[in-house]
Amino acid sequence: MGMLIARRLAFMVFVLWGITLVTFFLSRVVPGDPARLLAGPQASPAEVAHLARFYGLDDPLIVQYAHYLRNLLHGDLGFSFVTRRNVRTDIATFLPATIELAGCALLLGFVLALITGTVAAYRRGTSADAAGRLSAIAGLSLPVFWMALLLQLLFHTKLGWLPLGGRLDPGMTPPPHITGLLTVDSLLTGNFATFINAVEHLVLPVVVLAAGVYGLMVRIMRTSVLDSLGEEYVRTAEAKGLSRWRVLRRHVLRNAMLPAVTVLGLEFGLLAAGVFVVESVFQWPGLGNYAFQAIQANDYNATMGATLVIAVLYVVINLIVDIVYLYLDPRIRYA
């Protein structure tokens, strides 16, 4: 088990290095001049050239990349030309909002899919099975952008039940910063009014993001539970007189969860892509919105910093998934 984890860690290093390489050179291919952006539209060519020399933007690409890697190893992600702040400071500011949004969406989608997929498998061929499969198709097929606008139109414009976007109402005072997660910080400080307001702002973007997770996981859970129900050990457990709930909990779900856990790590990649759209539509001040604005402004350092952080989160989550998989399946642990 230790060797497997060590190999995963070594593989992570190469993956992250490859991401820095691809992101760096792609950002240089995109048309635009960061020095001009930093200097402003009224700056003279001499001032623009001075800034390019100062930040090393006129050096050969291989030299720029070497400087970038050296700074990266020292924890320096560079300077954002848009916010005029250190990229590491920006990421520390915007990342908690994205973690809160994506984490709630992943949890909601997984739990609902676990319940729906299991019920659909146990009631195969019934109306409950058909409803579960239909909801899975809807979750996978509805475009994220269209669903976000539709929910805004229905629940904010028409019904007025939920806010349009943002993390809090304009007049609401944020809780003291502890974790950066507004729901957690408001509970830790006993500010329940802020907690309710933060949850209200979370509902629509979380539902939009969770739809894709739910759609894929329902199909996987249904198929996995059906496969497990046909195994000899399940029929043996039922023949011994064990209750349906005990058979489900101890024998069916433990084995049916293996494919679901594997896909769960890949789902984060889909969430990362959806976050860019959802945060833009709902004006959610997270890392996806920050990266989207950085790409539009051709802000090299901010784009690469945000991409690297998302990549680190992705490989770390997949490492955790691998470890959980080793725990769930002893055949791999002792192989």
Predicted region positions:
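Hydrophobic alpha-helical segments of integral membrane proteins
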Residues: L9, L51, L61-L77, V87, ...
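Hydrophobic alpha-helical transmembrane segments of membrane transport/permease proteins
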Residues: V15-A66, L151, F155-T194
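Short loop segments and helix-boundary regions at transmembrane helix junctions
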Residues: V119-L142, M147, L153-K158
